[in-house]
């Protein structure tokens, strides 16, 4: 097989100066967007009670638990800034992504215990379903890091009702366990 690739004709043509310049401009635009996203993720990481308050209670934040649990450098967050209901914190309180734990890939989901003690809030069921869908599609184990005070009671009608409510999350979890 190596000989085939050594003798193979080059594919395509060299990029023109205009294409190279366009590529550089696109990269610069993407870097600006990434800076904006990174700043928003950092803002969400700092929402809620000060980290020291959690430490004084003997707790770790969800971000610290993820860092402790996963193999270094493997956590790839997915929906940290997803907020379909415009929650006052600017997030659904869900931290999720792909990660490796002891060399095995998994889908990881946790609740931000710095904001309302990790309570379920509006928009969270949709985020949870996105995560369980990914685990199902990729045939990966789903790891929950739950430190949750329950449901924000004035918003419970937004949590359980309809086909994409939190009840569906429980059903999906039962499916994944089979």
Regions found by a protein language model. Name each.
Residues 1-178:
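Terminal-region recognition feature
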